Amino acid sequence: MYQIPVLSPSGRRELAADLPAEINPHLLWEVVRWQLAKRRRGTASTKTRGEVAYSGRKIWPQKHTGRARHGDIGAPIFVGGGVVFGPKPRDYSYTLPKKVRKKGLAMAVADRAREGKLLLVEAFAGVNGKTKEFLAWAKEAGLDGSESVLLVTGNELVRRAARNLPWVVTLAPEGLNVYDIVRTERLVMDLDAWEVFQNRIGGEA
């Protein structure tokens, strides 16, 4: 059981959260690898010797020239020739069990909670879409830009106010994922986003 700090207009309080007690780094690595594989475009493509724009004519006779024997100029041995075993467009994605994905997400959030890097927010008071408003709020919340922050909220105005800052990554609650959690140093979520997260891991943590 973790005690998560909650920031509200009236002050700070704590919320008890049932998250995994043990963090499995390999499981987190598996989920991140799966995420990044899904993001790959897979459009790299090379031409084989049959696809390059050259004639298939033998460049000189097989014998009696004193030179090495060759076929057509599109052979891989020549500059500008085809490529042997080069990449072709492919899909790099693969399936990962849903239970593993849920556990990975729960563990990533638990890791931030264990480090004291998770902050829940009841309301972003005074933030109405302007970056300077978010900066003022962040200063009061103890976020000074020295650490990268993953901000998860369904409030479009808050996301708009924060997205311009190089040290903030903004996500909607449905977009919370292991990769963005582990690549940033702090995790800030509003209570609605926390509820969405709890529903996502529902009983599998």
UniProtKB/Swiss-Prot annotation:
Cellular component terms (Gene Ontology): ribonucleoprotein complex; ribosome
InterPro entries assigned: Ribosomal_uL4, Ribosomal_uL4-like, Ribosomal_uL4_dom_sf
Pfam families recorded: Ribosomal_L4
Keywords: Ribonucleoprotein, Ribosomal protein, RNA-binding, rRNA-binding
SUPFAM superfamilies: Ribosomal protein L4
GO terms for biological process, alphabetical: translation
Coiled-coil region(s): none
GO molecular function annotations of the record: rRNA binding; structural constituent of ribosome
Subunit structure: Part of the 50S ribosomal subunit.
HAMAP family, alphabetized: Ribosomal_uL4_B (MF_01328_B)
Family under the similarity heading: Belongs to the universal ribosomal protein uL4 family.
Entry function: One of the primary rRNA binding proteins, this protein initially binds near the 5'-end of the 23S rRNA. It is important during the early stages of 50S assembly. It makes multiple contacts with different domains of the 23S rRNA in the assembled 50S subunit and ribosome. Forms part of the polypeptide exit tunnel.
Protein name listed in UniProt: Large ribosomal subunit protein uL4
Source organism of this protein record: Thermus thermophilus (strain ATCC BAA-163 / DSM 7039 / HB27)
Gene name in the database record: rplD
